[in-house]
Amino acid sequence: LESFKGQTPYELHGDGDTSRLKFAGTGPLPVVSVRVNGGEEVSFFIDTGGSEVGLDTDFAKELGLPNFGKVQGTFSGGEQAEVGQSRIEQLTLGDWTVNNVPVMTLPFRQLSAGLGVKRIDGVIGTTLFYHFLATLDFPNGELVLCRKTPESLAAFLAEPSGKSVAVPIWMASDHFMVGWGRVETLPPTLLFVDTGLAGGGAKLAEPIIKEAGIKLEEDKAYSGAGAGGTLKIVPYTVSRLSFGDIEEENVPGLYDGPFPWENTFGFHLAGMMGHDFFKPYAVTFDFATMQIFLR
């Protein structure tokens, strides 16, 4: 925080009302091209399960970024890893540049092959989206950033669309977007929106899996890489999963051990909804009225 004295974090520069970034690569998560501190284009994946903008540890060293120490982070399956703290002067997102951006560092390059690109140098998390009216438009393959103003929201709401569903959300901690949903025929429960859950549409806490009568497919278990290390992943299928008034059937789920945030926030969190649940939709995050729109 001391490094931002006299400066405005997340200071936006650029013309126009919208900046668009096309998705690249063929992997399971959206990847966009950005520039850090005015350098060459690099590939970042998008993960609303993450908080701050993140840079690969080696990439941060190559850029000569300051090191403000480390904290312990908790990741999938309850894995722990040290997370570095730093900052960048500029992050260029399409036509816009954001100045004075706090960042965290982790060894993200190890995820490159699984994300279908030559090299991943970082990640865009939920905290950056706070400063925009942001849309992950999966059908059209692009990230759309609009200015966070009443006028932008009014223009968005006035756009013609087919089926559009608004789901109220709350924030837990600094980046956990939580809303009401249902698992199978269980009573309504709170679920975490994690578009960075690759290869699945759900990751449920073990008690919910058991209560819903969901069967783990142990014979199809495999190893996968997470930010905290390598995990044993066991697939399963959720016959019915809903978020607000959106319901999907036969949603692929992933079990990789204890769900570490089930009882962290003073309320019960039944699990998370991942990329496969949201990919049929354009998903807009409105942090002014605290709603997610699915179109």
What are these regions (language model features)?
Residues 1-295:
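Pepsin/retropepsin-fold aspartyl endopeptidases
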